[in-house]
């Protein structure tokens, strides 16, 4: 079975229609040798600081900068996302081929790669690269599927951006909060006097 994973349910429906997959199941559409499923944008995210080191759970200047030895991903805690991920994981475990139908771009590549990694996808993966959801564009895209590896640099760029955002966001937020907001709270009563 070929498993197609789109970034949104509406895109999955468009793709399924063109492929002739019409049988609606829980979390996917099946037919004509395809199972078309979807994410809801991001299902996975980089782990939180405390997922790497327990001492990072407490906000302290002494723990900065926080730089994990290796970044990891986790499911976003949301019952709807978790349920859909279980569907995706099950489909991928039994797939002969996966077709990444994520949005054509850096973020679309990152979103789908993280889901496939988390699901432990082992079969060959191909990439549908289209910028339009017309029937003609979808048909042409499926005629010209590309090896997933052709998009490794795009994925790595998205991953680098996500890691950079994490490093700056997590560290700067804590530094600013601990260093400067504490000064505001201390000096506030003094200014009112």
Where are these regions (language model features)?
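Intrinsically disordered, low-complexity regulatory segments
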Residues: 1-179
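Single conserved hydrophobic/aromatic residue that forms the stacking wall/gate
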Residues: 184-193
């Amino acid at each position: 079975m070929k498993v197609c994973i789109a970034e949104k349910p509406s895109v999955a429906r468009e793709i399924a229609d063109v492929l002739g997959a019409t049988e609606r199941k829980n979390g996917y559409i099946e037919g004509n040798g395809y199972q078309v499923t979807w994410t809801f944008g991001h299902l996975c995210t980089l782990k939180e600081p405390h997922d790497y080191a327990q001492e990072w759970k407490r906000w302290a200047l002494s723990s900065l900068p926080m730089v994990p030895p290796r970044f990891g991903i986790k499911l976003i805690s949301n019952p709807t996302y978790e349920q859909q991920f279980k569907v995706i994981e099950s489909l991928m475990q039994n797939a002969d081929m996966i077709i990444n139908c994520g949005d054509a771009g850096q973020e679309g590549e990152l979103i789908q790669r993280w889901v496939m990694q988390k699901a432990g996808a082992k079969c060959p993966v191909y990439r549908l690269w289209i910028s339009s959801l017309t029937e003609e564009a979808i048909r042409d895209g499926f005629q010209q599927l590309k090896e997933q590896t052709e998009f490794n640099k795009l994925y790595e760029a998205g991953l680098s951006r996500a890691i950079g955002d994490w490093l700056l966001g997590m560290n700067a937020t804590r530094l600013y909060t601990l260093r400067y907001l504490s000064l505001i709270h201390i000096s506030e009563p003094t200014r009112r006097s």
